[in-house]
Amino acid sequence: MVFRIASSPYTHNQRQTSRIMLLVLLAAVPGIAAQLRFFGWGTLVQILLASVSALLAEALVLKLRKQSVAATLKDNSALLTGLLLAVSIPPLAPWWMVVLGTVFAVIIAKQLYGGLGQNPFNPAMIGYVVLLISFPVQMTSWLPPHEIAVNIPGFIDAIQVIFSGHTASGGDMNTLRLGIDGISQATPLDTFKTSVRAGHSVEQIMQYPIYSGILAGAGWQWVNLAWLAGGVWLLWQKAIRWHIPLSFLVTLALCATLGWLFSPETLAAPQIHLLSGATMLGAFFILTDPVTASTTNRGRLMFGALAGLLVWLIRSFGGYPDGVAFAVLLANITVPLIDYYTRPRVYGHRKG
């Protein structure tokens, strides 16, 4: 008699996967609400577009592969991919961008490798990076938070800008991006990088309206705190483990603090790194993807620390203002190596 030994995992629980994905979707509610509050209805429109695109793309591939469409869609992984991409792009980006990015993420970055559990890279971040490299202007055209914005688009205006590029009154993105100082606004990280390169002092930069927040950038600090709240809830629900978020945030904070102490005139303070951009979204919702992250506890600590270091390096010295997506994908590359050297010793065998 021949016994076939399959590779781990030895149990496959569709309900467990679906439940975890659902918990992550629920935990995203505070972050989504904060982005709606500070950046308007465009975020909701992008989420709807991405969700529909993700489900249709996944259903199409499953149909072509002659696999069960209904059973696979119920695991909610396609919805989560669409959601993570949608909240990562500017709220008034053209409709075709989120559709293109989502379809690429689901078909190329996920299903091409065999579907959920087989993809080596985070699909949402693959989609994001493809869009960022292909359409850098549109992908960096964030609106100023409502508290410093001159023109705040309503729901109808948001839909019209996303689908036609103009509001009902004829305004365009350049008009909507104006802040209270009459200057076209960018994100806190983008503003800091651009201003330092232009020769402005940190003292001057901190006077810009975008930094009018209590701790970091206006609006962005509350968005990050909202994602943090959702992440803490995920930890409480035991949907994710603490190793990756903690090591990521501690490493990012440590690098930012040391850099700021050594070069306060050219490098951002730690609170700007921690509460701007996609820091908390990345820490709790992206890096913790169980498929593309390390699978051992020591490996998770190393994986998170590496991502934190990469985010700081890209933000401080790279060509892109945020860097979370690139850091995630670069860290994904190292996962097989990390897992190999941190795998637990087999019982009864010596080390080495």
UniProtKB/Swiss-Prot annotation:
Q: What is its EC number?
A: 7.-.-.-
* Cofactor(s) named in the record: FMN
TM helices/strands, residue ranges: 20-40, 42-62, 78-109, 123-143, 148-168, 214-234, 242-262, 267-287, 301-318
What Pfam families does its record include? NQR2_RnfD_RnfE
Its keywords, alphabetically, are: Cell inner membrane, Cell membrane, Electron transport, Flavoprotein, FMN, Membrane, Phosphoprotein, Translocase, Transmembrane, Transmembrane helix, Transport
- Bilayer disposition of the protein: Multi-pass membrane protein
Q: Subcellular location, in the record's words? A: Cell inner membrane
**Signal sequence extent:** none
GO BP field: electron transport chain; transmembrane transport
Q: Name one GO cellular component term.
A: plasma membrane
At what positions is FMN phosphoryl threonine found? 187
Q: Could you name the domain of life of the organism this protein comes from?
A: Bacteria
Role according to the record = Part of a membrane-bound complex that couples electron transfer with translocation of ions across the membrane. Required to maintain the reduced state of SoxR.
The record's similarity note reads: Belongs to the NqrB/RnfD family.
The record's section on PANTHER family has: ELECTRON TRANSPORT COMPLEX PROTEIN RNFD, ION-TRANSLOCATING OXIDOREDUCTASE COMPLEX SUBUNIT D
**Quaternary structure (record):** The complex is composed of six subunits: RsxA, RsxB, RsxC, RsxD, RsxE and RsxG.
- HAMAP family reported for this sequence: RsxD_RnfD (MF_00462)
Designated name of the protein: Ion-translocating oxidoreductase complex subunit D
Organism for this UniProt entry: Shigella flexneri
